[in-house]
Regions:
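Sequence-pattern detector for short linear motifs
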Residues: 172, 176, 191-194
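Short, structured beta-strand segments at or near domain termini in extracellular proteins/domains
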Residues: 183-197
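Functional-site microenvironments in short loops/helix caps that host divalent-cation chemistry
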Residues: 1-174, 181, 198
């Protein structure tokens, strides 16, 4: 619907979000169409990449903004979230807000907390932190349709308009089945920056 042209895309599954990243890569490569030009593919961010971006590269930052949980100044919320019991509209947004409604973080990224939660490429495991390290920074498994549901869970980050301040913290993680779309889950595409060595 045209009224939502500047809102985050929601209701898409992890599989659909991944397919969009692949389509976007193909579209970009066709539009450039030059030999010898390296174009990194679009993809979903890993859980670690997403969290680093949301924390402004600081291990102390719980939220993308400077301090606090966002509830200190009623009528001036830094994100679209549920600031109190049943207070969905207290931040003036009952549903996902338009993109760029709230201030960006220090990296210039908008809505890294609240508004809509976001798919990551990381497979969910309750012991995820133990499975990942510098040599193995991502736990990835692309489940097949025949796999059991427990293998189809993906990490979702950022919280959404329906979540309270605790669940929009950058260190919080949630899970959803990769074939399910939800009205509170969206995605953002990323690309790896290739250094020229200069």
């Amino acid at each position: 619907h045209p009224a939502y042209a500047h809102h985050p895309v929601v209701g898409v599954s992890w599989e659909q979000a991944t397919a969009f990243c692949e389509w976007r890569t193909m579209f970009l490569r066709r539009s450039i169409n030059r030999e010898g030009v390296l174009i990194e593919k679009y993809r979903l961010p890993t859980e670690a990449e997403w969290e680093l971006a949301a924390r402004n590269a600081s291990s102390d930052s719980r939220y993308p903004w400077e301090t606090g949980d966002g509830k200190e100044e009623p009528d001036c919320y830094p994100a679209n979230f549920n600031p109190g019991e049943g207070a969905y509209a207290a931040d003036n947004h009952l549903i996902p807000a338009r993109v760029r409604t709230f201030q960006p973080n220090l990296f210039g990224l908008y809505e890294m907390a609240g508004n809509v939660a976001e798919w990551t490429s990381t497979a969910y495991s309750g012991s995820g932190a133990e499975l990942m390290n510098d040599l193995n920074p991502e736990y990835r498994y692309d489940a097949r349709a025949s796999d059991p549901a427990i293998l189809k869970r993906k990490v979702v980050k950022g919280g959404s308009w329906k979540d309270n301040a605790t669940f929009i913290r950058s260190d919080m993680r949630d899970t959803e089945l990769q074939h399910r779309g939800r009205s509170w889950i969206g995605f953002r595409c990323v690309r790896t920056q290739v250094s020229t060595g200069k």
